[in-house]
Amino acid sequence: MKKIFVLLFCLAINAVAQSPASAPQSARGLPPIIDRDLFFGNPEIAAAQLSPDGKYISFLKPWKDTRNIYVKGVDEPFSAARLLTIEAKRPIAAYFWTRDGKYILYVKDNDGDENFNIYAVAPDAKPAPGAEAPPSRDLTGLKGVRVEIFDLPKNNPDVIYMGLNDRDKSWHDLFKLTISTGEKTLVRKNTDRITGWVFDLAGNLRMATRSAETGDTEFLRVDPVKFSKIYSCNVFESCGPLQFKPGNQRIYVQTNKDANLVSLALLDPQTGKTETVESDLLGKVDFGGALFSEATDELVETWYIAARAKTYYKEKAFGDDVHWIERKFQYPKNEVMVVSRTRDERLWLVNIVSDTEPGQTFLFNRKTHTLTPQFKIREKLQREYLAEMKPITYKSSEDLEIPAYLVLPKGVSPKNLPTLMLPHGGPWGRDDWGYNTLAQFFANRGYAVLMPNFRGSTGYGKKFLDAGNQEWGGKMQNDITWGVKYLVSEGITDPKRVGILGGSYGGYATLAGVTFTPDLYSAAVDIVGPSNLMTLLDAIPPYWESIRKLLYARMGDPNTPEGKAWLLERSPLTHAERIRTPLLVAQGANDPRVNRREAEQIVIALRDRGFPVEYLLAPDEGHGFARPVNNLALFMASEKFLGEHLGGRYQEGGSPEAAKRLAEITVDPKTVVLAKKIDPNSVGLPKPAVDLVPGTYKYKATIAAGGQQIPLTISTTIQEENGAWSAVDKTEGPMGEGFDSAVIEKGTLVTRKREVKQGPVSIKLEFADTKATGTFSMNGQDKPISVDLGGPLFASAAGAVQSIGCLPLAEGYTTNFRNFDPQSQKEKLMALKVLDIESIIVPAGTFDSYKVELTSGDGSSDKQTIWIAKESHKPLKVDAVLASMGGATLTMELVQ
């Protein structure tokens, strides 16, 4: 039995009429084509959880085509469930109950930017009159900040211990959050490279984990006035805390310090001494994980994953109950997963899963030994048409044995088949046995599908993992190549009809495959894969600072001549001229890990040499596609693309929504322009042609995000005050009022002061030519700001578009200048260009205007188009793409 600590979002969807399939579709013996909506569409019901007291079952279900949280009584039918959230922009990806069951908490980011905030809603809350669901409370309320959850103490269920990186984007300070009030209290400022905080079973802060400058992981005992180092493992080893043992004297940890395989151990925080509890009895794989009792906190099971999962039960009653369920469902053909338990462990929710069963969920009463069916995940998906997943091994270069999983299309002889390689992401992860959406989707289309766990994959020990060090595009890629050779030698694969598809590292492996083995593949699909390892490492998000040394050790150090040369050599972009395989590239515009430049660099390189390439860019996605409509569009394009080049079957057409979305995210490669990064040394201060003019400018505005239109009223007032210009922007909308004010130097229009007030947040800043200083305040807590600047700021606060109107605009005019972003607390370089002169109609009238484009010099998707009146220099209209809001758009037009 395999347990998973992350939520499994197994999707279900209503059956829709199958569209006729396109030629070649007549392969005899293959089952009927399964509609792609049943693989990638929205769920009917998924991710069910029991409330701790056993009163409720919560689950995810679509509301207006977006996954939201519903709740029902444990004995009520699902038809009686109540809607608890109304997130229309992006599906809820994860949620959990508080320890006392008073609240359901969930996290949400902005269109894939991975800056998560925590929201709370009570399961018994009632909607306001006319509303469909009760309001959720944003407990953190910070933009551009990533929340990490460290502990939910059992003895204080109204508390969350969490980390916020608002002070320093690279490191999270520790806060105590009171759920009922939203009050946040700083517990520890993180100035010591702390990556995690560990609490005992009584809710006491006992330990911290630290990423040393060398990349080593250190365990620290938290003493009253200092940290004491008690344990460490080096950059090539793995160690991490799990949970304190009852009594709080020792803690369970997993570690492979001075060993090949990860084992389970007990560590004494006072002495740092460890005692091995267990490791794999067969000596082949790492310790996989542990489960602890909700009632007693005792260890109840451990598991290991080789070709299949193997579980060891530490509590007899727990193991007996699992075995009783297994006998009901023909284990090992099907596996039993305990996915949720009540606080007293009287009730379980269990999923019955296999390679051809996405999941059936049952409520198990341990006292009465009764199993009550709840729902079937992907109920309309025809299980009888799905294919077996077979664990295999094959030899690669250096005679290294590579574990893999092979899925062969059902109903046909496994001979001379079109084949698809599916390398996993990470690359420090692995594939394992079970239902796999992509493998089943493409097997249904007639492909043999191979998922190799190439060297560098985790779970098989330190030696196997380290064999992938600095082997991106090298021996790691060889392992994928030798997988193709193995299938060809077995007669399974037609060597002229081999494709490769992958996401993240799998996308890199796709690009590396068509670059370093250009004759091996006949079609390739790269999803959010990096093309240039140098720019990938240069653009990693700040909250990855703790693993920077690990990335350099595993991939190559870009700060050394040898490392830089190796990274460039292993970058597909460097060798793009070798590519002669048809390629489809898909990218999320807001990806914080693999910047859209990674996709567009390779698209431009192929386009410029006249080689055909297809490009999909989703403006509302990040690292991978989360919205079902985007996934449907992606795989509508992918299966047709692969079918045309490899001869597999594909479904013609699909839902109108997916077809419409595919048209929207399809980009003509001819139009792709790589944003140029600005050299900070080339940026000065633009010289205005005229000064500001006192007055008030009123605009009607709209923010468009996730299919919603949010109306706003914006006004800017400019007046002279104390020998300088005072500018105040006032924004009024459904969420209340916000103010942004500035002090602007006369003549030069340099921004000298800025003050922002929005809800509980206030920011006060002063700008010298080379320094930004000030305070960020929220709920009575102040955080200092002190950032070096490369020069004075222009158009960096209220009155910004009015200041731009004062520049000597003319056809072809360009300039660069500096802004300061209080959200990231970094200097931002901006590029301005006059695109055209055109007539424009706004509520205030018809005007001849300069059309001005303003872009960010860091290559992000930030972009503004501003129309400035030629005669009066008034800003008439602004269209802005807001990367900080996940690609939302702002439009404002002058009223008077």
Task: Say what each PLM segment does.
Residues 438-459:
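Active-site machinery of serine-nucleophile hydrolases
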Residues 681-771, 811-896:
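Acidic, serine/threonine-rich low-complexity disordered tracts
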Residues 23-45, 78-81, 321-332:
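A short helix->beta-strand "capping" segment at the edge of beta-propeller domains
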Residues 42-45, 64-69, 87-93, 100-403, ...:
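Peripheral, non-catalytic segments that deliver or gate enzyme domains
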